[in-house]
Amino acid sequence: MQEFIKFTDSGGGAREQVVDTGSVVPFYLKFPGWPAAAGILLGSLVASSTASRTSGVVTVTATAHGITTGSTFVGYRFYYPGSPTLAAGLYDSILSIPDANTITFSAAGADFSSESINSGTAWTTATDLTTMTIKGNLLKDLSRVIIRIGKLGSTGGATKTVTETFGGSQLGVQTATSNSISDTSTGFRCYGTNKQLAFSYSDGGGGTIYQTLTKDITVDQSLTIRGTITAAGEFLALIGAIVEIIP
């Protein structure tokens, strides 16, 4: 026996899908505002990094910043650690990385010159890179959520960490130093409406972490991807992220 499941697309149009009675149909959510045809770049920069802005173009001067030069990350969203005139935050987007000491990106505002970035220190603080809201009652007993992430980073000795959180609590964590390129999956299964069992693994390998959370899935909860780099002159990039939900 078959049933019809009706969906509404972003333009308000109706769609129907035929499924067997009792079937569970997974669906996928994109992180809102994810940059088109690009990803998100976090760089630790270096001590004594400076920035200036001319006609909406910010030039970061950071000697041996460690980020791949050329066009690889042009168009990526960039986390800027902040300076007196320009607030810390994510900016769209990188315009150029012409050499090992320079990064340019777009940010509207008044011109300024030679401002110290992050009070003259490298950026090694855990940083939220993207987030979405899982609406209350979207998940049910035995629902499963999987966050699939593609990431890459510099090959120096600093630890590059990606952490996923649900409702502000850690779900999974993936760390790498010299081999920081991987596809990772982190997720959880719901038990009732107030318990989640979380798991995490990389490149199809076995689970690397397991957590028990007690979030109320009848109310809205945040789902966030966070990055951390432990030393100067390195970077971490999210090249893609999507959330699979099996209701």
What are these regions (language model features)?
Residues 2-43, 123-247:
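Surface-exposed molecular-recognition determinants
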Residues 43-125:
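Small/polar beta-strand repeat architecture
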